Amino acid sequence: MTLAINISNCPCHCPGCHSHYLWEDIGMPLTTGAIDDFVSQYGTDITCIAFMGGDSDPKTVNQLAQYIHEYHPQFHVAWYSGRLRVPHIVNKQDFDYIKIGPYIRHLGPLKSSTTNQRLYRRKMDGDFEDITYRFWRQRDVAV
């Protein structure tokens, strides 16, 4: 089970975004203390902590990922970004999963075989493999 943490102030403003309320700077600051509180509340029910957004401050998202791996190593860490690529200031090795790509309505979401979005999983050797196809229904995949 994944705990998805929405991060507001999204600069991407993708047309058709299902979370357009996150375009504004709303909510509470996401701190290491807040992460600890989430872990205390949901820790036995989750296996992954996912940051949904954070494109306006990728350095902080990276720092929070490092914190989780150091202080809560039992959890995987994921980041869903609307950017085309991971910013150079982010160390991809601090994440177990990374989704990149803006939402483009006519291409569809991650579950569509025509999507531009990609989900990557870090392998044991540190390389990342594209696992997007796992979200597609078999009948949607061209053979």
Explain the meaning of each model-derived region.
Residues 35-42:
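A short, N-terminal amphipathic alpha-helix
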Residues 58-65, 69, 108-143:
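P-loop/Walker A phosphate-binding loop and immediately adjacent motor/lid segment at beta-alpha junctions
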Residues 42, 68-72:
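Hydrophobic, Leu/Ile/Phe/Ala-enriched alpha-helical segments that form helix-helix packing faces
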Residues 19-31, 44-59, 74-87, 97-122:
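Core AdoMet radical
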Residues 12-15, 105, 127-128:
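Short, acidic Gly/Pro/Ser/Thr-rich loop/turn segments
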Residues 1, 94, 115:
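Residues that flank catalytic or metal-binding motifs in active/ligand-binding sites
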